[in-house]
UniProtKB/Swiss-Prot annotation:
Residues 226-355 are annotated as: Interaction with PPP1R15A. This is BAG family molecular chaperone regulator 1. Residues 154-234 form the Ubiquitin-like domain. Signal peptide: none annotated. Homodimer. Forms a heteromeric complex with HSP70/HSC70. Binds to the ATPase domain of HSP/HSC70 chaperones. Interacts with NR3C1. Interacts with the N-terminal region of MAPRE2. Interacts with PPP1R15A. Interacts with BCL2 in an ATP-dependent manner. Interacts with SIAH1, HSPA8 (via NBD), HSPA1A (via NBD) and HSPA1B (via NBD). Interacts with SIAH2. Interacts with ESR1; the interaction is promoted in the absence of estradiol (17-beta-estradiol/E2). It comes from Mus musculus. The lineage of its organism: Eukaryota, Metazoa, Chordata, Craniata, Vertebrata. The keyword Repeat applies. GO terms for molecular function: adenyl-nucleotide exchange factor activity; phosphoprotein binding; protein-folding chaperone binding. Coiled coil: none annotated.
């Protein structure tokens, strides 16, 4: 240090220096040290110096000539086989745990996806059903509307005495347009005048042909039709009441006949002791014959009734009542025949036992 300080020149005696130059770094050598041929080559093709200690090639770029020694890799001791086994086993355990977790996660995801799919399918089915119901309802409404639009209707004003009825005539099944029969039935419902006693007049003409279309008669919406006829005939009402009473009596006798038929079924099935069957069959036969006589009396009363031709309702009711009583008489004959068969079977059995 003393020598250096003594060798220094005084500040004023120093020679003027030029611009300060930066000294080159000790670890690198200037770019001019590399040859132009090497500079132009890619790094992979440049010349390298193999380190004597490490045995690896090191690039000579940036290394000063004979300045520093190249770095030497430390020798690493080889791992023991036991540590390698422990490491491999721990890795396998970790991998198995990860796989198990991933499987669990995958299973949970699959369940969630399944639930979502089921919920989606249920919602789709519900929406489809609602859409189907809505479509069906819409179609039904459209069909009803189209039927109403397609069905020809006719509004008619019917006058009866001092009363007025606004009627809407529609055709019955099988008819494409309303006919006189449809109008007459509607008038009967509205006024109470029976159809046989109606006289419908339109433009001075009586409507007698029941199958004639109203359009063929020149009827249009708002046309007027006059009704002539009484709501009820007192004389016919008396005859209808008689027929009604006879019908009620016939139904009561028919109910009694059903009870006799049940008694016969009990005897046939053996619900009664054999010693009492013969006597029970005789009593049952007498009851059936009495029932037949009651039905015959009703027929006689019906035959004695005299009904004029204009009493069409009474005559029709009498005809139906006669048919009903004849059906009851046929049932009586069937029961009586069964009683005779059962009596003969019982007698043959008793004879066989006596022999």
């Amino acid at each position: 240090m003393a020598g250096r300080s003594a060798a220094r020149r005084p500040r004023g005696d120093r020679e003027p220096l030029g611009p300060r130059l930066r000294a080159p770094r000790p670890a690198r050598e200037p770019r001019q040290s590399e040859s132009r041929a090497e500079r132009g080559l890619p790094p992979s093709q440049r010349s390298s110096v193999r380190s004597a200690a490490s045995g690896h090639d090191r690039s000579t770029r940036g290394a000063p000539a004979g300045a520093c020694k190249p770095r030497v890799k430390k020798k690493v001791r080889p791992r023991s086989s036991q540590s390698e086994k422990v490491g491999s086993s721990s890795r396998e355990l970790t991998r198995s745990k990860k796989v198990t977790r991933s499987k669990n996660v995958t299973g949970t995801q699959v369940e969630e996806v399944t639930k979502i799919e089921e919920a989606t399918q249920t919602e789709e089915v519900t929406v489809a059903e609602e859409v189907t119901q809505t479509d069906n309802m819409a179609k039904t409404e459209e069909m009803v509307q189209t039927e109403e639009m397609e069905t020809p209707r006719l509004s008619v004003i019917v006058t009866h005495s001092n009363e007025r009825y606004d009627l809407l005539v529609t055709p019955q099944q099988g008819n494409s347009e309303p006919v006189v029969q449809d109008l007459a039935q509607l008038v009967e419902e509205a006024t109470g005048v029976p159809l046989p006693f109606q006289k419908l007049i339109f433009k001075g003409k009586s409507l007698k042909e029941m199958e004639t279309p109203l359009s063929a008669l020149g009827m249009q919406n708002g046309c007027r039709v006059m009704l002539i006829g009484e709501k009820s005939n007192p004389e016919e009402e008396v005859e209808l009441k008689k027929l009604k009473d006879l019908e009620v009596s016939a139904e009561k006798i028919a109910n009694h006949l059903q009870e006799l038929n049940k008694e016969l079924s009990g005897i046939q099935q053996g619900f009664l002791a054999k010693e009492l069957q013969a006597e029970a069959l005789c009593k049952l036969d007498r009851k059936v014959k009495a029932t037949i006589e009651q039905f015959m009396k009703i027929l006689e009363e019906i035959d004695t009734m005299v009904l004029p031709e204009q009493f069409k309702d009474s005559r029709l009711k009498r005809k139906n009542l006669v048919k009903k009583v004849q059906v009851f008489l046929a049932e009586c004959d069937t029961v009586e025949q069964y009683i005779c068969q059962e009596t003969e079977r019982l007698q043959s059995t008793n004879l066989a036992l006596a022999e």
